[in-house]
Amino acid sequence: MRNLLLACLAFPFSLFGQDNAKPLSIKGSFKNVQPEPEWVYLYHRVNGTSVKDSCKVIDNAYTFTLKMVEPELLAFRVKYANAGSAKQFTPLAGGSTSNQSRDAFNVYAGDGRIRINSTDSFSNVSIKGSKHHEAYLALQALRKPYDDKMKVLYQDYAKANAKKDTEARDRVEAQIDVLESDLKENVLSGYIQKNPSSPAAFYALQQYAGWDINPDKVEPLFNALPAAVQEYPTVKSFKEQLETAKLTGIGRMAPEFTQNDTLEQPVQLSSFKGRYLLIDFWASWCGPCRQENPNVVKVFNQYKDKNFHILGISLDRAGQKDKWMKAIHDDNLTWSHLSDLKYWDNAVSKQYGIRAIPQNLLLDPTGKIIAKNLRGEALAKKMEELLEGK
């Protein structure tokens, strides 16, 4: 359920220079595309920051020249003559192309020369010159049956959520979880194992790992990547995330930390030993977090007198303590709360490798991590298993 519920995302990329950059030349053209394209926008990353480049269309053609330090999923969008400004566009979450707009498309590219021809519509493209994109399309073809089913389930989830039909929503969520697991194991993992040297292998690994890396499954796949690929800046950053995940996986002792509470008093994680503890990463600005809070409140109220406590870690922003406090009050979160108000630079979230929220970890009374990312009925069932009759 990652793409639905992990809607609050961080994009931590290592900063890097362009000393090893190689040129990428992109030439595009149009045939029978109406309305008439006026501008083409290209979204990519430079030194870890999202950048939008633009090119005015002249004689049904456009050109971009980039410096590439590693392969990247590029996003293209169009502004038509006499039309409003193009909206912000980035590559689709999860890598799916099933929801692509007529006015947008993605290209997975490295260095070299690429030719893009659009016929009848902007996104009806033929792309030549990129072995990376050919590998990407082959992977997308394997994904497509799953993505098509996922699209329908997402629509069902949205309908149930709009009707506040929690039973139907939870049922669809369970179906999505199963389908995502099947996609990862049957398509992504298999693709990497069979094609570790493919230009799209690391892209597939990113999709497989998701926002909550399982090091036992991910590390063998990572180690199969060619040594040259492991030197790419983003791959090195991924390796760091993998190492962090190894320290915070199920069965490991939760790393110690200290952070201030709402009264600016330092609180240590170890002070909660002796109780089952749910470490809950959230923020007042995170819609999915706020949506999940009633479920967490229900479980807390049921088990708070049975050796169970919750420790909230907020990723709220500097200067917005009032919003953090208001969310605590409005959502009736009557447990312990910590934050350094540093947004995605929250020290605890970085220590634990948190790159999307909501996320949580369940600790046993010794401080060992025994479960992760329990939501809704899953959290209630786990606590019933651990504490009923005690």
Enumerate the language-model features and the residues they cover.
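N-terminal targeting signals for export/organelle localization
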Residues: 75-77, 84-104, 114-117, 181-253
